[in-house]
């Protein structure tokens, strides 16, 4: 099996569709089908900040239930799940945009979207090991020694939030260690979470969150070819959102 892993979408539905079509998938059946039997994998953070978060949820949720694509959640997915469960969460860092979309829907549509997303999240693995162990997909990455472990405790925290130090930057974002610079595992780890201007490939890892929602690009990693494809964002570019790894 060959895979195309798509990075953080954050509600950029139009760019997602454009990238899927650029990768050679047909959408005539309503779900992505590739003539060479490739499979799409979504890297989490489907929603928040962008203009069409719930359209992304509908597309990915239905495609996963159809068996056409794979999905692992990100930290924004985790927070949206807690919001839909009725847990106390702060409507900030983009969740407020998804919540506004949701509240503008008719009641039945709200229920349908909520139920679809909750099924999607509850059935999803926190990280995926694919291609006979040669490819690992984890939203914020994973240490070599943790591949194969149950995603609980520190492993769960890592795959959702990265290698955080507990400290914060002046803008409130967490300080993260550059785990990829020290990765020495054999499997390729595909991750996102931290926006970078260009895909960062180092030591069998690649960060493909190229900040589509911040006006840059939406990127996919093709495996086993080890190549990338991307489409430009339609949103305004925000230089302040991009920083050097980690």
Curated annotation (Swiss-Prot):
Catalytic activity: P(1),P(4)-bis(5'-guanosyl) tetraphosphate + H2O = GMP + GTP + 2 H(+)
GO MF term list: bis(5'-nucleosyl)-tetraphosphatase (asymmetrical) activity; GTP binding; nickel cation binding; phosphatase activity
Record bears the keyword Hydrolase: yes
Gene Ontology CC: one annotated term: cytoplasm
InterPro entries on file: Ap4A_hydrolase, Bis(5'-nucleosyl)-tetraP_PrpE, Calcineurin-like_PHP_ApaH, Metallo-depent_PP-like, MPP_PrpE-like, Ser/Thr-sp_prot-phosphatase
Enzyme class, first EC level, given as a word: hydrolase
UniProt KW keywords: GTP-binding, Hydrolase, Nickel, Nucleotide-binding
Cofactor(s) required for function per UniProt: Ni(2+)
Gene3D superfamilies according to UniProt: 3.60.21.10
Disulfide cross-links: none
Source organism superkingdom: Bacteria
Enzyme Commission identifier(s): 3.6.1.17
The keyword Repeat appears for this protein: no
Entry's family note: Belongs to the PrpE family.
Protein purpose: Asymmetrically hydrolyzes Ap4p to yield AMP and ATP.
Protein name (record): Bis(5'-nucleosyl)-tetraphosphatase PrpE [asymmetrical]
Organism: Bacillus licheniformis (strain ATCC 14580 / DSM 13 / JCM 2505 / CCUG 7422 / NBRC 12200 / NCIMB 9375 / NCTC 10341 / NRRL NRS-1264 / Gibson 46)
Lineage of producing organism: Bacteria, Bacillati, Bacillota, Bacilli, Bacillales
Name of encoding gene: prpE
């Amino acid at each position: 099996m060959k895979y195309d892993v798509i990075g953080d979408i954050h509600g950029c539905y139009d760019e997602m569709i454009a990238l899927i079509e650029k990768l050679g998938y047909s959408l005539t059946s309503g779900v992505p089908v590739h003539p060479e039997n490739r499979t799409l994998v979504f890297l989490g953070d489907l929603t928040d900040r962008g203009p069409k978060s719930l359209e992304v949820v509908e597309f990915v949720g239905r495609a996963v239930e159809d068996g056409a694509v794979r999905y692992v959640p990100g930290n924004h997915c985790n927070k949206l799940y807690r919001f839909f469960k009725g847990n106390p969460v702060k409507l900030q860092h983009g969740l407020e945009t998804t919540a506004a979309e949701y509240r503008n829907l008719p009641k039945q549509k709200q229920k349908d979207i909520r139920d679809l997303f909750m099924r999607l999240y509850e059935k999803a693995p926190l990280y995926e090991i694919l291609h006979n162990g040669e490819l690992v997909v984890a939203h914020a990455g994973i240490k070599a020694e943790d591949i194969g472990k149950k995603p609980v405790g520190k492993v769960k925290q890592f795959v959702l939030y990265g290698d955080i130090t507990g400290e914060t930057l002046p803008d409130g974002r967490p300080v993260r260690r550059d785990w990829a610079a020290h990765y020495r595992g054999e499997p390729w780890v595909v991750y996102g979470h931290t926006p970078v201007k260009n895909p960062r490939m180092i030591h069998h890892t690649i960060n493909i969150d190229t900040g589509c929602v911040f006006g840059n690009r939406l990127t996919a990693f093709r495996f086993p070819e080890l190549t990338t494809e991307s489409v430009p964002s339609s949103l305004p570019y925000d230089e302040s959102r991009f920083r050097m790894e980690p």
